[in-house]
From Swiss-Prot:
Every 4Fe-4S ferredoxin-type domain range: 55-84, 95-124
Recorded name of the encoding gene: ndhI
Subcellular location field: Plastid, Chloroplast thylakoid membrane
GO BP of this protein: photosynthesis, light reaction
Protein name from the UniProt record: NAD(P)H-quinone oxidoreductase subunit I, chloroplastic
InterPro entries found in the cross-reference section: 4Fe4S_Fe-S-bd (IPR017896), 4Fe4S_Fe_S_CS (IPR017900), NADH_quinone_OxRdtase_chainI (IPR010226), NDHI (IPR004497)
Statement: the UniProt record of this protein carries the keyword Transferase: no
Source organism phylogeny: Eukaryota, Viridiplantae, Streptophyta, Embryophyta, Tracheophyta
Family: Belongs to the complex I 23 kDa subunit family.
Cofactor: [4Fe-4S] cluster
Oligomeric form and interacting partners: NDH is composed of at least 16 different subunits, 5 of which are encoded in the nucleus.
Top-level EC class: translocase
Residues noted as binding [4Fe-4S] cluster 2 in the record, renumbered to the chain: C74, C104, C107, C110
Function: NDH shuttles electrons from NAD(P)H:plastoquinone, via FMN and iron-sulfur (Fe-S) centers, to quinones in the photosynthetic chain and possibly in a chloroplast respiratory chain. The immediate electron acceptor for the enzyme in this species is believed to be plastoquinone. Couples the redox reaction to proton translocation, and thus conserves the redox energy in a proton gradient.
């Protein structure tokens, strides 16, 4: 008879423990009810990137001295720098500069080690194309600045919403 009583006691303890665990998880679920949604509706809303986000590389042709430090700093030797030595002034003249973003790993070493700061990382992350050859950007395509995400109308609306302002005050 005692084994049957201890079996009922164990069953009762396990039932109480399971009810407590269910109650705890339900309280956690209810605590998330007052929070703002984290998911963004991607094609209609854009992700606000962090300050140090490593997106597409921006290149300023006039600042480049064709030193090829970016090529040596790149772990995959990606930037293609074509230059010509001007014998009369004994300096290199940059002819072409290109980066293939289909191969780039966006490590940012080229930007970090550039002595003239002609390279910078932008907040542009929408680089998808149907043809991989379109991901090879020359100096003209690299020189275009993207539209800032914070200038987008939908992002400004989200940032100016009362819910976001209340969250910032807390």
């Amino acid at each position: 008879m005692f084994p049957m009583v201890t079996g009922f006691i164990n069953y009762g303890q396990q039932t109480i423990r399971a009810a407590r665990y269910i109650g705890q998880s339900f309280m956690i679920t209810l605590s998330h009810a007052n929070r703002l949604p984290v998911t963004i509706q991607y094609p209609y809303e854009k992700l606000i990137t962090s300050e140090r986000f490593r997106g597409r590389i921006h290149f300023e042709f006039d600042k480049c001295i064709a030193c090829e430090v970016c090529v040596r700093a790149c772990p995959i030797d990606l930037p293609v720098v074509d230059w010509k030595l001007e014998t009369d002034i004994r300096k290199k003249r940059l002819l072409n500069y290109s980066i293939d973003f289909g191969i780039c790993i966006f490590c940012g070493n080229c930007v970090e080690y550039c002595p003239t700061n002609c390279l910078s990382m932008t907040e542009e992350y929408e680089l998808s194309t149907y043809d991989r050859h379109e991901l090879n950007y020359n100096q003209i395509a690299l020189g275009r600045l993207p539209i800032s995400i914070t200038d987008d109308y939908t992002i400004r609306t989200i940032l100016n919403s009362p819910q976001t302002k209340e969250k910032a005050c807390d």
